Amino acid sequence: MNTQTITLAQLATACQNAAYINVHLYTPAMSSLSTFKPDQIRFLSASTGVPLLRFQSKTSTIVLQALSIQAAVTPSTPGNEIPFGRCTYSYTTYDFALDGVNYSVNIFQKT
């Protein structure tokens, strides 16, 4: 795991292969695993109401909605793939803090 500053320009996770993707969001208060249509993905900052994470359906990318935040990134690599039925999913984990809350976001993609 490495730590880096993520900007809007830097963080764009392609998801061309799946009409639905799973986003696993952890916070101290809750954890949720849901399947969203791409245009339904939207997590808001509790204090500002600014979207933290959204899906750009026109460009099929996921972007973190912050100009610059510190995030520890565990990229998708061979070995962190999950078989599910006939498909295999890879995932990338982004750990970051915003508004004093720690978040861990796992973005699953069909490979």
Tell me what each language-model feature is.
Residues 80-96:
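Low-complexity, intrinsically disordered Gly/Pro/Thr-rich segments
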Residues 1-9, 35-38, 70-81:
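Charged, amphipathic alpha-helical segments
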Residues 29, 57-61, 98-102:
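Glycine-centered tight beta-turn/hairpin loop motif at sheet-sheet or coil-to-beta transitions
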Residues 25, 55-57, 93-97:
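Short beta-strand segments that buttress and anchor functional surface loops
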Residues 95-111:
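Edge beta-strand at a domain terminus
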Residues 1-33:
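Long, hydrophobic N-terminal alpha-helical segment
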Residues 41-44, 60-80, 110:
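Structured surface patches comprising rigid loops and adjacent beta-strands/short helices at the edges
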Residues 23, 30-57:
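N-terminal glycine/threonine-rich, aromatic-flanked beta-hairpin/loop signature
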